Amino acid sequence: MKRIILTRGIPASGKSTWAKQEVLKDPEHSIRINRDDLRNMSGQYWVPAREDYIKACKGTMLMNAINFKFDTIIIDEMNLNPKETGYLKEVVSIMNDTFKDNNDKYIIEIKDFTKVPLDVCLERDSKRENPIGENVIRGIFNKYKELYNLKETSDE
């Protein structure tokens, strides 16, 4: 079976670094989808009025990747919101129903980065060319810390 891998973790936990390296292992059969990259390609990074467009682009890329039968599709995002991951699972299930050959069907896997502590993520973010910022990362951490048992420091 083919795989759709959802990275899961707060910003700067290593998701994109891992995903970019992973697709290089088999570039002919692997693809990475990332909304941040779509935003950067569209001009100014954060334009709230453009988010529906970005979401539609991501959906189109996913459908095309499935139709082109890539072996591995990595959705390189936080994937922390259960509602969003549930939607992705539903879309994949519907697409799988259209394939007669089981070898064309996809399974969903989670590549988990939720064990990377907040302090490590904040340090990594501070070294980025375009940091997200401590307040934003802490906000995301606080929103999901109970759901995923997120840790603030390496000592916990």
Task: Report residues per predicted region.
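Conserved substrate/cofactor phosphate-moiety recognition/catalytic segment
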Residues: 17-72, 122
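Conserved nucleotide-binding/hydrolysis micro-motifs of P-loop NTPases
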Residues: 37-39, 79-80, 114-120
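Conserved beta-strand segments of the P-loop GTPase G domain that flank and frequently precede/overlap
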Residues: 74-76, 111-114
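Conserved GTP-binding G-domain of TRAFAC-class P-loop NTPases and closely related GTPase folds
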Residues: 1-8, 13, 21, 27, ...
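Short His-Asn-centered micro-motif
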Residues: 8-9, 35, 75-78
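Glycine-rich phosphate-binding loop used to anchor ATP phosphates in small-molecule kinases
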Residues: 49-106
